[in-house]
Amino acid sequence: MSMQDPIADMLTRIRNGQAANKVAISMPSSKLKVAIANVLAKEGYVESFRIIEDSKPELEITLKYFQNKPVVESIQRISRPGIRIYKRKDELPKVMGGLGIAIVSTSKGVMTDRAAREEGLGGEIICYVA
């Protein structure tokens, strides 16, 4: 059976992995998943990530905890395959009043809402992370 929304699956694996206090999680790899993992690592929401090259590449994400509590409080898919959500540069949302991030897919790659605002870019809102 094919997966309908691999990004939602990735976010669910992160959410479930942290709820179960897992050290690391793995999933099938794709360019978009690696770009999202890169943003999460740069912003400090996950410890690290790596790509395991096999017959089918796997993405392994090392989760991050602070005082035995998950760093990611909430992670929510916004733009879905059935309902794509696009925003112009002046419409980009501020998650939790600027405390969280929105991950945005722009013409210059996947970045946070802050980076997209600085670049003067809009794009597809992939998810909110707080």
From Swiss-Prot:
Entry keyword Transferase: no
GO cellular component: ribonucleoprotein complex; ribosome
InterPro entries in alphabetical order: Ribosomal_uS8, Ribosomal_uS8_CS, Ribosomal_uS8_sf
GO terms (BP aspect): translation
Alphabetically ordered keywords of this record: Ribonucleoprotein, Ribosomal protein, RNA-binding, rRNA-binding
Classification via PROSITE patterns: RIBOSOMAL_S8
One GO molecular-function entry: structural constituent of ribosome
Origin: domain of life: Bacteria
Role according to the record: One of the primary rRNA binding proteins, it binds directly to 16S rRNA central domain where it helps coordinate assembly of the platform of the 30S subunit.
PANTHER family to which the protein is assigned, alphabetical: 40S RIBOSOMAL PROTEIN S15A
Subunit structure: Part of the 30S ribosomal subunit. Contacts proteins S5 and S12.
Family the UniProt entry places it in: Belongs to the universal ribosomal protein uS8 family.
Listed name of the protein: Small ribosomal subunit protein uS8
